[in-house]
Amino acid sequence: MITTLYKEPASFAHEFSNINLLWASLFIEELVRNGISDFCIAPGSRSTPLTLAADQHTEAHTHVHFDERGLGFLALGLSLFSHKPVVIITTSGTAVANLYPAVIEAKLSAIPLIILSADRPVELIDCGANQAIDQYRIFSHYPVFFAQIPSATTHIKPNYLLTTINQGLQQQRQTPAAIHFNIAFSEPLYPQTATLNYQGYLQSLKQWLIDKQPFSQYFQNKDSFQAASNTQLRDKKVLVIAGRVTGINQAQAIAEFAALNNYPLLADLQSALTGNANNLHYYDLLLVNKQFTENLQQADIIVQFGGKLISKRLSQFIEGFAGEYLLVDPGNTRIDPAHSLRKRFVCSATQWIKSLQNKIPDIDKHWSQVLQQQNNYITKQIISPFLDNNLISEISVISALDKLLPADNPVFIGNSMPVRLSDMFFRQNAALPFSNRGASGIDGLLATASGIAKSCASITTLLIGDTSFLHDLNSLALLKQLQGPFVIIVFNNDGGAIFNLLPVPTQQKQDYYQLPHGLTFADSCRQFSIDYYQPESLDQFVGDYQKSLQNRLSLIEICVKNDQTYNHLEYIKEQIKYATF
């Protein structure tokens, strides 16, 4: 027997018997906000929070059937006729497996189904617990999106659920088929008499609770770009962030957009815009200063182009930002580690900027000017005086390279300390920056830089840490294939100096994190016929680098104490933190 139930509309509550019921209600609410109205439900205990949430939602039409296999095909029929996604809710165990035939048909017929399968919590899997099977990706490649949702907890922001739902729906819009959310529910599953007030927990959804729109909205065509963009940006203080951007024309479009509208720009190293006049070059360091941060928080909206930001402080700023936050990026992957993104434009920077058509009216140039003045102040009063000596250090070498790197030639910057310092201290760099910031690993960096050098046949510079270099030492064999010049700059701080910046236990720091090796790389260079330099002053480094630009293969080893960079950064941050502008 199949039963269909209809109800009348109400607003989202703050009080629930337990967090399972809250999370389930968030799930159903966000699906309804995305225009989904049909919910097919099979009976089961573990799926109780989802069943009750669907039943209690006034805009959810529920269809009930005792057999999951038939329920799956019922959902297919509903979707076939309505041309809308249909939700299927099941309990755990073989109940989920019975949906497999419908999931296959959905894939082959391009029919959008949304599976919400309840699961046992992780501690009850593979231990003999009742009705507990491995449901992780149970439908193999047939769904176009899968998410394993952990057991509900107040330690995970509710935003995570909403952004995950919307990412799945976005994938489904592009490739209609099933999407699968496997949701672990710990007990209690049922309502109790007493309720808890979750208003504080839901604070990060304040605007979502008011506006009745999906938390994350995706825009993909020109009309929607123009309507959304012009409405949002008009008469607003806009902060532009440039993340990883592909192509010089994209970077130039972002720079012109910021300059034309007097918007402050925070340019990540990967954007190739660090030398732009509008860029607040030292924003990462300035974010330790309360006055600067408060000024930056006056922004009404953040427009971010590209993702994978290097600066942790900037990512934290975005996470705590109270205004509107939108992202422009042509890729399909989610770029939202803070789970705070409300609007995502799936297009290139040039497409999005062109869709604005006209110059947005100027507003409050003073705000942008104050931010630039604060950036200029620390440049003149703190950074420049600190660098005004001949001391060789990781920071001084990067600051020197900022002026020395050949324009329009590639520089590959290794992960860990080199990329962070480069992001902090490059100011006018006109080289083409590259890095492996997808997974941010420290392996294969020399080999990647070699590939770039083979492709471009121009001067290539590699900036790499000693531990990363040790990881990829055998890739020196690749260099014999290069025409050159190829310049390797190794920061040798005798192990993982990056861990000085992290709160690792002091007692175990050397033996389990930094692993000092006591090695230098002169002999490695002899073995592979590479010119070797080890400068002892900044002036020597400048001379050695300029000579290396005339050689085929060169390695410049910068040997510094393990704690030098940590001490220098702490000094600089302390000066900036207490600066008054």
Curated annotation (Swiss-Prot):
Any one biological process term the GO annotation gives: menaquinone biosynthetic process
UniProt cross-references to CDD domains, sorted A to Z: TPP_PYR_MenD (cd07037), TPP_SHCHC_synthase (cd02009)
InterPro entries referenced in this protein's UniProt entry, alphabetically: DHS-like_NAD/FAD-binding_dom, MenaQ_synth_MenD, MenD_middle, THDP-binding, Thiamin_PyroP_enz_TPP-bd_dom, TPP_enzyme_TPP-bd
Catalytic activities: isochorismate + 2-oxoglutarate + H(+) = 5-enolpyruvoyl-6-hydroxy-2-succinyl-cyclohex-3-ene-1-carboxylate + CO2
Pathway terms, separated by semicolons: Quinol/quinone metabolism; 1,4-dihydroxy-2-naphthoate biosynthesis; 1,4-dihydroxy-2-naphthoate from chorismate: step 2/7; Quinol/quinone metabolism; menaquinone biosynthesis
Keyword Metal-binding: yes
Enzyme Commission (EC) number: 2.2.1.9
Pfam families documented for this protein: TPP_enzyme_C (PF02775), TPP_enzyme_M_2 (PF16582), TPP_enzyme_N (PF02776)
Cofactor(s) for this UniProt protein: Mg(2+); Mn(2+); thiamine diphosphate
Gene Ontology MF terms: 2-succinyl-5-enolpyruvyl-6-hydroxy-3-cyclohexene-1-carboxylic-acid synthase activity; magnesium ion binding; manganese ion binding; thiamine pyrophosphate binding
Alphabetical list of SUPFAM superfamilies matching this protein: DHS-like NAD/FAD-binding domain (SSF52467), Thiamin diphosphate-binding fold (THDP-binding) (SSF52518)
Alphabetically ordered keywords of this record: Magnesium, Manganese, Menaquinone biosynthesis, Metal-binding, Thiamine pyrophosphate, Transferase
Entry annotated with the keyword Cytoplasm: no
Top enzyme category: transferase
Comment on bound cofactor: Binds 1 thiamine pyrophosphate per subunit.
HAMAP family registered for this protein in UniProt: MenD
Record family assignment: Belongs to the TPP enzyme family. MenD subfamily.
Subunit field text: Homodimer.
NCBIfam families documented for this protein: menD
Task of the protein: Catalyzes the thiamine diphosphate-dependent decarboxylation of 2-oxoglutarate and the subsequent addition of the resulting succinic semialdehyde-thiamine pyrophosphate anion to isochorismate to yield 2-succinyl-5-enolpyruvyl-6-hydroxy-3-cyclohexene-1-carboxylate (SEPHCHC).
PANTHER family, per database record: 2-SUCCINYL-5-ENOLPYRUVYL-6-HYDROXY-3-CYCLOHEXENE-1-CARBOXYLATE SYNTHASE, PROTEIN PHYLLO, CHLOROPLASTIC
Name of the protein in question: 2-succinyl-5-enolpyruvyl-6-hydroxy-3-cyclohexene-1-carboxylate synthase
Organism this protein belongs to: Psychromonas ingrahamii (strain DSM 17664 / CCUG 51855 / 37)
Lineage of the organism: Bacteria, Pseudomonadati, Pseudomonadota, Gammaproteobacteria, Alteromonadales
